[in-house]
Amino acid sequence: MSVIKEYRTASEVVGPLMIVEQVNNVSYNELVEIQLHNGEIRRGQVLEIHEDKAMVQLFEGSSGINLEKSKIRFAGHALELAVSEDMVGRIFNGMGKPIDGGPDLIPEKYLDIDGQAINPVSRDYPDEFIQTGISSIDHLNTLVRGQKLPVFSGSGLPHNELAAQIARQATVLNSDENFAVVFAAMGITFEEAEFFMEELRKTGAIDRSVLFMNLANDPAIERIATPRIALTAAEYLAFEKDMHVLVIMTDMTNYCEALREVSAARREVPGRRGYPGYLYTNLSTLYERAGRLVGKKGSVTQIPILTMPEDDITHPIPDLTGYITEGQIILSHELYNQGYRPPINVLPSLSRLKDKGSGEGKTRGDHAPTMNQLFAAYAQGKKVEELAVVLGESALSDVDKLYVKFTKRFEEEYINQGFYKNRNIEDTLNLGWELLSILPRTELKRIKDDLLDKYLPLVEV
């Protein structure tokens, strides 16, 4: 049994950091409790150790701390989350404490929030379909169990509504398997938190969800712990309770801002745009916790959501996220301004594992061919629209005009399904065929004749 060590040797507080001197046998990442002169308890984590000095990262901020009268206790273990199957259906704050007025959780065990490194050899390949009910994702950018597929949004775009829609609608097609959603919110406003909770409550989706809410007025440093706490809960449900867990994390930009704040307080040499040079490594410790394990029934799938500062996809946060994850869903200001919801720009969006989750036995045999044909037709239609702007519509051929018609209907009916319409994969595929029937059969060169004969609707000439 570890001995709790208590000190009164705090020498300095700088922003969210505290320096404690004359420490002995203290470990990196060790949990710290600071008892203030008025009895208030605040928590922190050992960030760095040098000789007999420890740098502590404070989760609840440093205001009101009297260095001479504060007692610092090192717990002998890292920050841990109390986990239980009863977490499902509950709402917690960013540090894992219940805030829904329900009873205290009776933990089955305590787990280190940093998780365990997954041996690459023990990973199982993602190859099963997750249905979000959103055509632009299910058909064109298929989400697969165990994948990490981020959403790149911009200022003013409805990524919160998209996140809530996915949390409400996402499911696995085999009804015999348990499915849960873990939702981690970082730096959101009170109104946004109420929106998420109300959306899940009124549809009953709260009963299969675990929510962790870090609000904008909560300490920024808490945001560093929130996604790790959420992923710890997800790993417990997936690998110990055999559930398929979808983790939605929003907004990762706020998480990275908190990292930058700590880095600045430590006076580290800044990297690109002032973010720490280890931003890539730090993000990978979150994103790489998605996946499946050999011999385990459950899976952890991630949808991290981030807002691109100034809509710049080359900004360090989306840039590094794109390197680590397996694709991206990109939201478009142009589609949003035209009234399309959700405004997913399907052409630059990508799911690198989409071919692993589609096909006979997973979705339908015509999934991949129709996906390729829709991409090709939509890209051609956008080119024709640009040509019409330059040369005028009179310069378009009859086939070009059909492509323009296809593009308009594709955006109005396929992309613009709304935030409250849940389309199953059958309905999505059938809608794709209906739109492709606008074009002459000779233009559908990416689909084999047997599939055209089977699915292409008869069109009156």
From Swiss-Prot:
This is V-type ATP synthase beta chain. Pfam families: ATP-synt_ab, ATP-synt_ab_N, ATP-synt_VA_C. Keywords: ATP synthesis, Hydrogen ion transport, Ion transport, Transport. The gene is atpB. Disulfide bonds: none annotated. Belongs to the ATPase alpha/beta chains family. One of its GO terms (molecular function) is ATP binding. Signal peptide: none annotated. The keyword Chloroplast does not apply. InterPro entries: ATP-synt_VA_C, ATPase_a/bsu_AS, ATPase_F1/V1/A1_a/bsu_N, ATPase_F1/V1/A1_a/bsu_nucl-bd, P-loop_NTPase, V-ATPase_su_B/beta. GO terms for biological process: proton motive force-driven plasma membrane ATP synthesis. The lineage of its organism: Bacteria, Bacillati, Bacillota, Bacilli, Lactobacillales. It comes from Streptococcus pneumoniae (strain Hungary19A-6).
